[in-house]
Amino acid sequence: MGGTALRTFEGRTIGWALCGSHHTLALVLDVMGQMCQAGAEIIPVVSAALAGTTTRHGTGEEHVRQIAEVAGRAPLTAIPEVEPFGPQRTLDVLLIAPCTGNTLAKLANAVTDSAPLMAAKAQLRNGRPVVVGLTTNDALGLNAQNLARLLVAKNIYFVPFGQDSPHTKPTSLVSHFDLCPDAVLAALEGRQLQPLLRSW
């Protein structure tokens, strides 16, 4: 991030929702740390899939602890904890990264059964920006209709993405998570960071 980003994040409250894409967590946390250092106040929100699942990438408890260390506060994990984001107008922007295909589909269809989705609903209630950082194997498959719905939705923006493995996983899309800071800044200005489609 350059000097402009460093200045702009001062005084900004950013909700950061993390879903169950365990293999991208280390990269996402590195970017979160950069944004904290740039002056952002990060309020982490974690899905049950991330907080309660053990994979080869670690346990849910380990992930929650790592997120708390980077953000400087314990993640919110329950729907009642994030529901006040709406009436209290807590967030300047909500970033969902990583956003799984499951969360993408539910967001597109107004399903609110997790803390990240409740945070998004609360944010959209206030007409404030939600930024989506994708990582899903079916974005160009069965989830394509949900992606299309969100691409044209008001106040929803995306971290630029591309096909990470077009020959072995032709329907997969992954956002360039290093662009999260720029995507957030653009969303705060009411615009989509361009170009949206970027190769890997």
Could you describe each region identified by the protein language model?
Residues 1-130, 135-200:
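A cross-family phosphate/adenosyl-ligand binding-site feature
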